[in-house]
Amino acid sequence: MATNYIFVTGGVVSSLGKGIAAASLAALLEARGLNVTIMKLDPYINVDPGTMSPTQHGEVFVTQDGAETDLDLGHYERFIRTKMTKRNNFTTGKIYSEVLRKERRGDYLGATIQVIPHITNEIKARVIDGAAGYDVAIIEVGGTVGDIESLPFLEALRQLAVQVGRERTIFMHLTLVPYIPTAGEVKTKPTQHSVKELLSIGIQPDVLICRSDRMIPANERSKIALFCNVPEKAVISLKDVESIYQIPALLQSQGLDEFVCNRFHLEGKPADLSEWEQVLYRQANPTGEVTIGMVGKYVELPDAYKSVNEALKHAGLTNRLTVHIKYIDSQDVETKGTDVLKDLDGILVPGGFGYRGVEGKILTAQYARENNIPYLGICLGMQTALIEYARNVAGMKDANSSEFVKDCAYPVIGLITEWQDAEGNVEQRSENSDLGGTMRLGAQQCHLIEGSKARELYGKETIEERHRHRYEVNNTLLPQIEAAGLKVTGLSADRKLVEIIEVPNHPWFVACQFHPEFTSTPRDGHPLFAGFVKAAKENQKK
């Protein structure tokens, strides 16, 4: 069966929620029994977001196969069952890199390389490749219509729509319909101008998703339909909602999934949203609440920890609790002391890079260990917990990571120079390797030790979790730390790399080298986060 395409663009302003809208529509189509995937096309020139500042771009989401991608792919995986891969996200930088590589290799036989056709052909080829095998592929274009950067992507999609046939393509455009309090009405003119901008490059939208803080009246929807040349039933009002997980039902109530299926002549059962109804019920009917302190380096932009934030909320759903997240800059722990950690039910230290704020994370781990506060450390949060234990329990006063201090007496964390990837191939790195694309990335197997909290939570011996790091526990110094009581409860498949540590005689102190947040979903949660939030609730009873 041929793949059908839905191209999602945005207009008027950025940050309207194209990714959430695309994921919600995908969830609806999946609930009708269709096989759906989503792709994100990013117009920036970086090859991938792997080396971009978290405070500028937000979180880097890691896929099962090790791609460092846009955080929207996290939304996609939280809404649908399809796992994202390297094929689901590419940038202008990646496209140009590939075209230039082919030119140097002589693939173009001496032709003059141009945006059209060479860049647009490469974009089309990647979209077709990523969409192969699915009933519907939803392709989101980053940025706003009118941006210079996104023009090659839009031109490529215009051409693709012509080539595969308009009966197999839908252009879905998100716009802002602002409410003007002084006039007491919503204004449709920005939407009309945004559609005019699309028309100027040869694209007629088939569906308009109109973002507003309220439902758009029927008469205004009729006006938008008339002046934008779109059927009235394809003008969808998408108001602000309390939970993003309400959006699939909101789109369904206006018949968007039915419109798509009719357009593509797809037969399917009515969308079964019972799982989403259960999510919303648990969200609306909590039996208690907990406050989790997230001690990080990039807390000025919560999106830098988007998947962690969502995983905590999912754990709240699992435990029927409302989770309040208190963001604490790890540098504040250094300058103001551990008083900033008081009145927390649990403490989570997420990943990060660089020495800034690390001593604050180490102090945080010490505070949680000594005061019996439930602690979950992720990536750097595990490494700082191990450094703290080495310094204050194992007597290794100068313990540190070679990432931060090159010549410390006890480099308990060191650069991984060799590891085995998921296929069993050995990868090697040195301190001179490029920063981009050189980490231990993607899903790796982990062996859990019998009798550990981790084994109890997961309920099985072997798990698979996603990684993004280039430093690991130094095995030569590990015996000294274990002799002081620290338990290693998770190891890599070849038993060479430490994956999970636990502090014994503590209510709940678990830290992992991998990133469990990337596989947490609202429907299924994640065992580590669920166990952590449950322990935080039990901590209130003390």
Swiss-Prot record:
Catalytic site positions: 379, 515, 517
Catalytically driven reaction(s): UTP + L-glutamine + ATP + H2O = CTP + L-glutamate + ADP + phosphate + 2 H(+); L-glutamine + H2O = L-glutamate + NH4(+); UTP + NH4(+) + ATP = CTP + ADP + phosphate + 2 H(+)
List of residues binding L-glutamine: 352, 380-383, 403, 470
Record-listed ATP binding positions: 15-20, 72, 239-241
Classification via Gene3D superfamilies: 3.40.50.880, P-loop containing nucleotide triphosphate hydrolases (3.40.50.300)
Pathway connected to this protein: Pyrimidine metabolism; CTP biosynthesis via de novo pathway; CTP from UDP: step 2/2
Positions that bind UTP: 14, 187-192, 223
Binding site for Mg(2+): 72, 140
Cysteines joined through disulfide linkages: none
Highest taxon above the source species: Bacteria
EC identifiers of the protein: 6.3.4.2
InterPro entries: Class_I_gatase-like (IPR029062), CTP_synthase (IPR004468), CTP_synthase_N (IPR017456), GATASE (IPR017926), GATase1_CTP_Synthase (IPR033828), P-loop_NTPase (IPR027417)
Assembly: Homotetramer.
UniProt family annotation: Belongs to the CTP synthase family.
UniProt name for this protein: CTP synthase
Lineage, highest ranks first: Bacteria, Pseudomonadati, Pseudomonadota, Gammaproteobacteria, Pasteurellales
Gene from which the chain derives: pyrG
